[in-house]
Amino acid sequence: MARYRGPVEKLERRFGVSLALKGERRLAGKSALDKRPYAPGQHGARKGKISEYGLQLREKQKAKFMYGVSEKQFRRLFAEAARREGNTGVLLIQLLEQRLDNVVYRMGFATTRRFARQLVTHGHVLVNGKRVDIPSFRVEAGAKIEIIEKSKNNPQITRAIELTAQTGIVAWVDVEKDKRFGIFTRKPEREEVVIPVEERFIVELYSK
């Protein structure tokens, strides 16, 4: 299944939670979810009972759409998490958080992961001084992530940094906003990653 490219606000209304897909509109309380907090469609406001499988699938889809990964990428990450020693669900979240596009977003250089992915693919991001244009590139602890010199005054990046001042930066990165670089200091603990996803249902889904 390819990466979703449709109307992102419909996804948030379908799931009933913010997936951080519309950064500035969400912060301003102007997103479609804020205005219409129910699923789109004629019967969107109705709440039906969801099956166990439906719940498992729902959590997987939320994670996929939030991090902007395809089904193939998601399965590959889950398989890697399952092979490692430890809690598979927690390891999966950590692997998703280590994606370069996500780290750029977490550092506050983009209002959404989608824009962060564009910054990476268009060559605006350096990792340890080298240009990397692969959004799925895995960032390891201690890596320096920097916006290239000619893009440091990009108005969208500047606006993202201004908005980040309202929400704060996550604990596992250190950022020099004025210099447009940051350090990915460590992998996050699960309780630090505030996302509307219950990964245990994803583990149950793929363990069948």
UniProtKB/Swiss-Prot annotation:
GO terms for molecular function: rRNA binding; structural constituent of ribosome. GO terms for cellular component: small ribosomal subunit. One of its GO terms (biological process) is translation. Signal peptide: none annotated. Coiled coil: none annotated. Part of the 30S ribosomal subunit. Contacts protein S5. The interaction surface between S4 and S5 is involved in control of translational fidelity. Belongs to the universal ribosomal protein uS4 family. This is Small ribosomal subunit protein uS4. The lineage of its organism: Bacteria, Pseudomonadati, Campylobacterota, Epsilonproteobacteria, Campylobacterales. The gene is rpsD.
